[in-house]
From Swiss-Prot:
Species this protein is from: Homo sapiens
Family: Belongs to the FAM90 family.
Compositionally biased spans, kind Polar residues: 341-356
Further comment found in the protein's record: Primate-specific FAM90A gene family, thought to have arisen during multiple duplication and rearrangement events.
Pfam families xrefs: zf-CCHC_6
Region listing for Disordered, in residue ranges: 1-42, 70-389, 415-437
Protein name: Protein FAM90A11
Length: 464
């Protein structure tokens, strides 16, 4: 019975079994087209063409023989912009053009406001907009533009001085500069100081001519050297009623008595030009503390010197005691009459009572006295008609009770040089030691007793 089977039936069964296995292995989904068929949904990754895949034999990247030059499918006129774009007419602007026009008009309206603000802050006239962008050359255009007031330019130059006045004041400035340049700070401060005297006192002063050379002295404090210009004396001496200084009065009374024993010290007519050379317009006097000193009718100077500043060794006007003589109250031509110590002996007033009334001392105030005792020895040469003059010395000593004693020393004559002590016994004006009340000064200022006396040898050598 086995031999009787048909072999064809066995072959059909085998084919069916193989097809079933293929169907089980095949993925679920649409069946891929055969490679020869073209599917426009596919795109080749190698060449980027549509209709085949990268595994297809139609891809030119795998089969260069089958590669063909791509041919254009047809000419399309709508894609290329062969004709240029024509601008639209301004009469019918589009919506975009309307927005642009509004934005341009806004800054144009803000321009006048900006120009007005700039005109307010800068002061410049605003620029007038020209019509049609053309400049007008009409002569009346400037009247239409608002403009501010013109600025006034002032010059800081000083007015010129008349050459005649400049030449006349040059001599005064030269004399004044030679004197003020040689003054020490204490001496400059003493020019502005004043002390009070009784209202009933009347003093007259005589000024002596001042020659150019000066005398040095030996001392621990800086010396006062004055080199004023020499001026020719004019006329007689001026008398100052109740305005002359106390220093002038005492020295004038002392000089006539000293002429017998000291012929060198002589009175000379006061030169008015010397007052100008020293830069003072009037004689200063010792007036009451609350009143201003009276002024004598002497020629006033054109330019007064500036008030000197107070240094460590200088004092204001209120620092001088009322009943004592201050340091350098009146800067007059005779240097011997320029400075005296803080006090003058009462004996000098008694001896000169025949010519000058006695000095009435007022009770001392609670003001501090001079912080330092300055060297007051001044020497001068007389006129050419005299042989020579001697310096006037004032000796200051500090006592134990805090007071000061002053003594007036007269230098010996030029021909018979002697020691100051020996001449002290001969001179009738030698004042005894007198005590003047004074407020205590700190020891840092008065570090030692200042004793001012120059030897006759030094003064004689300087005079020669």
């Amino acid at each position: 019975m086995m031999a009787r089977r048909d072999p064809t039936s066995w072959a059909k069964r085998l084919v069916r079994a193989q097809t079933l296995q293929k169907q089980r292995r095949a993925p679920v989904g649409p069946r891929a087209p055969p490679p020869d068929e073209e599917d426009p949904r596919l795109k080749c990754k190698n060449c980027g063409a549509f209709g085949h895949t990268a595994r297809s034999t139609r891809c030119p990247m795998k089969c260069w023989k089958a590669a063909l030059v791509p041919a254009t499918l047809g000419k399309k006129e709508g894609k290329e912009n062969l004709k240029p774009w024509k601008p639209r007419v301004e009469a019918n602007p589009g919506p975009l053009n309307k927005d642009k026009g509004e934005k341009e008009e806004r800054p144009r309206q803000q321009d006048p406001q900006r120009k007005a603000l700039l005109h307010m802050f800068s002061g410049k006239p605003p620029e007038k907009p020209l019509p049609n962008g053309k400049g007008s050359t009409e002569p009346s255009d400037y009247l239409r533009v608002a403009s501010g007031p013109m600025p006034v330019h002032t010059t800081s130059k000083r007015p010129r001085v008349d050459p005649v006045l400049a030449d006349g004041s040059a001599t005064e400035m030269s004399g004044r500069g030679s004197v003020l340049a040689s003054l020490s700070p204490l001496r400059k401060a003493s020019l502005s100081s004043s002390s009070s005297l009784g209202p009933k006192e009347r003093q007259t002063g005589a000024a002596a001519d001042i020659p150019q050379p000066a005398v040095r002295h030996q001392g621990r404090e800086p010396l006062l050297v004055v080199k004023p210009t020499h001026s020719s004396p004019e006329g007689g001496c001026r008398e100052v009623p109740q305005a002359a200084s106390k220093t002038h009065g005492l020295l004038q009374a002392a000089r006539p008595q000293a002429q017998d024993k000291r012929p060198a010290v002589t009175s000379q007519p006061c030169p008015p030009a010397a007052t100008h050379s020293l830069g003072l317009g009037s004689n200063l006097s010792f007036g009451p503390g609350a009143k201003r000193p009276a002024q004598a009718p002497i020629q006033a100077c054109l330019n007064f010197p500036k008030k000197p500043r107070l240094g460590p060794f200088q004092i204001p006007e209120s620092a001088i005691q009322g009943g004592e003589l201050g340091a350098l109250e009146n800067l007059q031509p005779p240097p011997a009459a320029t400075e005296l110590g803080p006090s003058t002996s009462p004996q000098m007033g008694r001896r000169t009572s025949a010519q000058v009334p006695s000095v009435e001392r007022q009770p001392p105030h609670s003001r501090p006295c001079l912080p330092t005792a300055q060297a007051c020895t001044m020497s001068h040469h007389s006129a050419a008609s005299h042989d020579g003059a001697q310096p006037l010395r004032v000796l200051f000593r500090r006592l134990e009770n805090g007071r000061w004693s002053s003594s007036l020393l007269a230098a010996p004559s030029f021909h018979s040089p002697e020691k100051p002590g020996a001449f002290l016994a001969q001179s009738p004006h030698v004042s005894e030691k007198s005590e003047a009340p004074c407020v205590r000064v700190p020891p840092s200022v008065l570090y030692e007793d200042l004793q001012v006396s120059s030897s006759s040898e030094d003064s004689d050598s300087d005079l020669e």
